[in-house]
């Protein structure tokens, strides 16, 4: 039931609008409740012959006036309530989106995209139904029920009123019996819908792999299973909901039968008049719709509680990474990074993935990080971005602990290219200028030239205004990576981090991009904001880091070697072995098993690699 606080806060915030809307809807129902009584008076007048033409015209005019006012107030009240219901829909989706932006990657490892889509679409719509249609029907039905019961008891006969409304006392028992079952089944239906959305997202996102493997029949079968699950859960919900919806009118019909029987007896006994009997019969008939509305409202409430609880559970999730309280440095980053004795393990895990990592990089410098998959390179990038919090005192920027910077300030000072080079389903220009609300076209073109993708872009039908499709599906892998790097350059941040972002680029283009980036790291022409950059290049391709000022070699979460390219080759260790493997060069080993590395050999092999004759084996 905690989820109901969401609705309570919303109604309390807009209490005046809801008060006005509810008042107008209630007024419409109260006016409608007067019509049976007026018809009863007209019936008695016609029977007794006391109703002349003038009075008849008055009653007809009064009934017409009541009808007009009822329609106007009912329409106005419903519009007000529905408008605020739409506003709640907007606010809830905004809150969900903002919450997702604060959550760490570990949350997304535990929850599927489909489930989150179900929250934003299906659950929010169910809540909107509660605060718009639910409130309107509840007020209308309840006002009509109370007004009719009062008029029947006061102007007709209280005993007949009890006979007509007595069966309705069973409705609370129905709510207690079926309510929890409806609520539980609604939650299961929403979860099944989330699972189907996840399957749909995966199949569409991986449609190339599906077609390449010719497994359409397999994914269709899996999708059908998900749909069958939804149908099964929905049918269980429909059976329970329909049972509840059928039993409420049954109670109304029982009341109508009691009224006909007992009312007929009172009429023949001359306890009530014919007009009273007609009015009472009309009241009971009039109550059918509001009682069905109240039954529908109870159904909506049970479904909404399940959705509200799901939304509330998400909104209550506490982000694992937050701005620290106390000493906060809200100032721009300058570009000096130092990592000292960093050991890190993921939350909930006892195994450390990084062990005693130390290095530093300053403005105008480039640090290369290489290592096999799973060696901890990307984890380090996550820590620098504070997607996870590093231990206190292990990572500092400009001489201050990284934890002392606000998250917004920290991430504003870092331009990052992820491994997958993720692009958004918008134009090329908006992807490159993603850090600006209104991207500068000339600046975007200059960044594209630096990453050697400008020539490709101007060949597109709409050039920089070309829509690239979901995740850049209309682009090649190399084009996506180069646009992602251009996006990093466009941001013009003091720190640049590239996480294996050149894997889909050919060697000559890679060499051109890296040469431009090295120049950029030292001086970005026309940039007074950040004249020099501290650049970190993470890669398993050694050609991407060979010109870095310092290279650190990761293995099993540890730094096993460090130095520049020439120094690491002269050591003849892990880096040198990787270099020769990627260059596709083999030599006979000396008798002692050690390879003799001479400077001429190095020069020749570097030329070979630069020419692009290499074979990746990592």
Where are these regions (language model features)?
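Transmembrane helix-loop-helix hairpins at lipid-water interfaces of multipass membrane proteins
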Residues: 18-76, 80, 154-161, 271-274
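Short intracellular "coupling" helices and adjacent cytoplasmic loop segments at the cytosolic face
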Residues: 80, 86, 94-118, 122-126, ...
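An intracellular "coupling" helix at the cytosolic face of ABC transporter transmembrane type-1 domains
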Residues: 8, 13, 105-106, 122-131, ...
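Transmembrane helices of ABC transporter permease
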Residues: 13, 17-30, 34, 133-188, ...
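ABC-type nucleotide-binding domain
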Residues: 330-618
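Alpha-helical segments in transporter systems
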Residues: 16-37, 59, 63, 80-82, ...
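A short amphipathic helical element positioned immediately N-terminal to and/or at the very start
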Residues: 1-15, 116
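Helix-loop-helix
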Residues: 50-58, 151-169, 236, 240-309, ...
């Amino acid at each position: 039931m905690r989820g109901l606080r969401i609705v309570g806060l919303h109604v309390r915030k807009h209490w005046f609008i809801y008060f006005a809307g509810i008042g107008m809807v209630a007024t419409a129902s109260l006016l409608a409740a007067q019509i049976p009584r007026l018809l009863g008076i007209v019936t008695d007048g016609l029977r007794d012959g006391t109703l002349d033409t003038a009075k008849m015209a008055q009653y007809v005019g009064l009934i017409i006036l009541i009808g007009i006012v009822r329609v106007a107030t009912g329409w106005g009240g419903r519009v007000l309530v529905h408008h605020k219901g739409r506003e709640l829909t907007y606010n809830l989706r905004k809150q969900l989106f903002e919450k997702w932006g604060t959550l760490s990657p570990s949350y997304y490892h535990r929850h599927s995209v489909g489930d989150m889509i179900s929250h934003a679409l299906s659950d929010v719509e169910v809540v909107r139904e509660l605060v718009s249609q639910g409130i309107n029907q509840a007020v209308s039905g309840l006002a009509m029920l109370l007004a009719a019961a009062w008029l029947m008891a006061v102007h007709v006969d209280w005993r007949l009123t009890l006979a007509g409304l007595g069966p309705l006392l069973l409705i609370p028992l129905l709510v207690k019996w079926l309510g929890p079952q409806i609520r539980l089944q609604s939650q299961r239906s929403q979860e099944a819908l989330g699972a189907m959305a996840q399957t749909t997202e995966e199949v569409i996102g991986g449609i190339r792999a599906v077609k390449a493997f010719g497994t359409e029949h397999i994914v269709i079968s899996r999708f059908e299973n998900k749909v069958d699950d939804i149908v099964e859960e929905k049918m269980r919900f429909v059976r329970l909901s329909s049972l509840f919806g059928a039993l409420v009118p049954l109670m109304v019909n029982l009341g109508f039968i009691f009224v006909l029987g007992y009312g007929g007896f009172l009429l023949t006994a001359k306890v009530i008049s014919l007009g009273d009997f007609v009015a009472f019969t009309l009241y009971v008939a009039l109550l059918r719709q509001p009682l069905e509305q109240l039954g529908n409202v109870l159904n909506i409430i049970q479904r909404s509680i399940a959705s509200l609880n799901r939304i509330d559970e998400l909104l209550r999730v506490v982000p694992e990474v937050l701005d620290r309280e106390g000493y906060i440095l809200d100032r721009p980053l300058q570009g000096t990074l130092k990592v000292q004795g960093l050991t890190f393990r993921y939350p909930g895990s006892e195994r450390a993935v990084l062990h005693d990592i130390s290095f530093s990089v300053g403005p105008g410098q480039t640090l290369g990080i290489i290592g096999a998959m799973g060696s901890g390179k990307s984890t380090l990038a996550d820590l620098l971005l504070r997607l996870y919090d590093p231990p206190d005192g292990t990572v500092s920027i400009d001489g201050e602990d990284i934890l002392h910077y606000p998250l917004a300030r920290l991430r504003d000072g870092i331009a990052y290219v992820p491994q997958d080079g993720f692009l958004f389903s918008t134009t090329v220009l908006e992807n490159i200028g993603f850090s600006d609300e209104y991207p500068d076209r000339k600046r975007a073109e200059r960044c594209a030239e630096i990453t050697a993708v400008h020539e490709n872009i101007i060949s597109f039908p709409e050039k920089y205004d070309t829509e690239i499709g979901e995740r850049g599906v209309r682009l090649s892998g190399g084009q996506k990576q180069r646009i992602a790097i251009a996006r990093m350059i466009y941001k013009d941040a003091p720190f640049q981090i590239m996480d294996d972002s050149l894997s889909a680029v050919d060697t000559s283009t890679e060499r051109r991009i890296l040469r431009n980036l090295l120049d950029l790291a030292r001086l970005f022409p026309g940039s007074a904001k950040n004249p020099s950059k501290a650049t970190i290049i993470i890669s398993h391709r050694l050609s991407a880091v060979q010109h870095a000022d310092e290279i650190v070699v990761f293995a099993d979460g540890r730094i096993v070697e460090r130095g520049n390219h020439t120094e690491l080759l002269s050591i003849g260790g892990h880096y040198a072995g990787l270099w020769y493997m990627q260059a596709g060069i083999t030599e006979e080993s000396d008798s002692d098993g050690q390879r003799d590395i001479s400077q001429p050999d190095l020069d020749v092999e570097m030329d070979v690699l630069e020419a692009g004759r290499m074979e990746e084996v990592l």
